[in-house]
């Protein structure tokens, strides 16, 4: 991922100005800054859901990123977990983890039992082993940190090429945040 002269302003206020960065496969990068410093804006620009001001460009795998929907970004192997995660409150944990994903394997559609097993494995991978909920529990019964765990599990489900987490551990307990 390469960013060249990326700027973004809202009226007369610059959220980002002249950003040049390179990220490489396998690298974990953390952006740290005050509230309003432009971290979320940069995440949206890299994922292609927001355009930089004219003159700047983002290149991922030698392809220039243009403005597109979150679904198109996902199809390009880019997954984002925003601080205001979008979950379907009345659906189960496993339905949310698989939301928007084609549920197939090499033999056809994946069974609900397989979805549940995969959801349990993903949630354990990031440190959730609660006896209070099961993958069939609805999201509206979860704490803020548990909801964030569902969103992160969704992001890592198919091992996207680029996963961006925008304040992913804000609502999590310290032990859960360390695992993430």
Positions of the model-derived regions?
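Glycine-rich phosphate-binding loops of nucleotide-dependent enzymes
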Residues: 1-180
